[in-house]
Amino acid sequence: MARTEGDSWDLANSVGATATMVAAARAAATRRSRPIIADPFAEPLVRAVGLDLFTRAASGEVDLDEVAAGLGFARMVDTFAARALFFDKFFADAIAAGLRQVVIVASGLDARPYRLPWPTGMRVYEIDQPEVIEFKTTTLARLGASPTADHHPVGIDLRDDWPSALRAAGFDAARPTAWLAEGVLIGFLPPEAETRLLDNVIELSAVGSRLAADYGTINGSSAESQQLAQQMTEGWRAHGLDMDIAGLTYPGEHTDVAAYLRSHGWETATADHGDVVLAAGLAELTAADRQSPASTIGFVTAVRSTD
């Protein structure tokens, strides 16, 4: 089903199911003999969502890489583990630079407010659909998990007036902020909503603020991309999952986030999928690996150095 303005979802359906898939990949990565990330909350969160394939993948009963490779997505676990590590390092660098305010947009099943070793005085805000925020905070509370920072979840759709909701939750725009947009600017918002999101981030960012994001689209307009999207949709359906890749993303030209930030005076550094995998200490991507949807995604870290 195609996306519509104002549509909603939970973690078992539509865009929400992709967040559960990513968490299952983090759980699988955590189980490896030499893991590059440790996310002890990924498996119980996936289990609580209740999608059978991802539950079994998170627990190690099913090889998620094997399943995904059959759908045209090579090295899925490496992809999402390396992405998580890339953004974890972004936060470590922000902390070292003295930043003590974080905003995670479209946080999904991201458990960074609980799993990262935040310093004293760190305020962490996370924004997502109200149902997603409620599910995650309730599930983690039942597990006995406590945030490792001063945690402020904000339940609101990014297509709504989230800046006002963020301020109402205590966000201080006068303080430098580390912003994370992981897995959201890759086609899951309409192009105009992407630039609106970035404009809001820029407006709310004091000098010294930082942003990290992945960007592009997982569903290109070429015949090859459309064929791969159809292959993945049919494959997920065969596993009992309704994840129509073409239907989950918005058509149109999506935002070059790095270029947009540079045009607004931010200093940027970019990387591609292969760079991020190599930086994580994993094997270099082969030509076949580069045919996966992740190969089209770029990464940026940026700093606002002037008004």
From Swiss-Prot:
Gene Ontology biological-process annotations: methylation
InterPro entries documented for this protein: Ppm1/Ppm2/Tcmp, SAM-dependent_MTases_sf, SAM_mthyl_Trfase_ML2640-like
SUPFAM superfamilies: S-adenosyl-L-methionine-dependent methyltransferases
Signal peptide stretch: none
UniProt-annotated binding residues for S-adenosyl-L-methionine: 128, 157-158
Keyword tags: Methyltransferase, S-adenosyl-L-methionine, Transferase
E.C. code: 2.1.1.-
Gene3D superfamilies: Vaccinia Virus protein VP39
Domain of life according to the entry: Bacteria
Pfam families recorded: LCM (PF04072)
Gene Ontology MF terms: methyltransferase activity
Keyword flag Methyltransferase: yes
Keyword Acetylation: no
NCBIfam families (alphabetical): mthyl_TIGR00027
Family the entry assigns: Belongs to the UPF0677 family.
Its biological purpose: Exhibits S-adenosyl-L-methionine-dependent methyltransferase activity.
Protein known as: Putative S-adenosyl-L-methionine-dependent methyltransferase MMAR_4570
